Amino acid sequence: RFTSEEVIWLTLEFYRRNYIEGLFLSSGIIRSSDHTMEEMVRIARELRTIHNFRGYIHLKSIPEASAHLIEEAGLYADRLSINIELPTDAGIGQFAPEKRPDNIRQSMGNLRLKIEEMAEPTMQTKRRKKFAPAGQSTQMIVGADGANDATILGTSARLYGSYGLKRVYYSAFSPIPDSSRNLPLIKPPLMREHRLY
């Protein structure tokens, strides 16, 4: 695991050398949702305000984190994402019972409202502060549950319509040794991921 300082240093060094054009920042939960989100916001804030970083920042938000932290993240990140995880609520309940689909959708809805609110001009200015100017996206794992392509595409269509997403990403399920017995042992063909796009 990298420290926040290491992530900042690596990002700046790779950016200066033209190895990268930006940063995709994601993390598993460390201590708590808020602690993890605070660290990710700190990285984005320091890159922008202290180091004048002009590259792209995509920050993967944690739905259980406090709303003010997700709002602060949007001031420094070009795009925010909240992962839907799986195409159906039943799949989430079966394979990720610690996740709450309603919380995920509520966070996505709140983020959409904030993006729209910050895009509206005010009486004092023609534009407000930038807030996640590249919008929000999500990702779902395909092939872990029994959802067929029609179900996955239906879920994607609802997500685009309901939350104003800029992109739904698909990631083919990859089995992990010694994981839950509920998960399939065989990886779905990569062609399925490509077909969904």
Task: Show the residue positions of the predicted features.
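A conserved active-site cap/scaffold subdomain adjacent to cofactor or substrate pockets
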Residues: 138, 149-184
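Conserved Radical SAM active-site core
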Residues: 1-138, 144-146, 159, 182
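Helix-hairpin-helix
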Residues: 197
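Terminal amphipathic helices with adjacent charged low-complexity linkers/tails
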Residues: 189-191
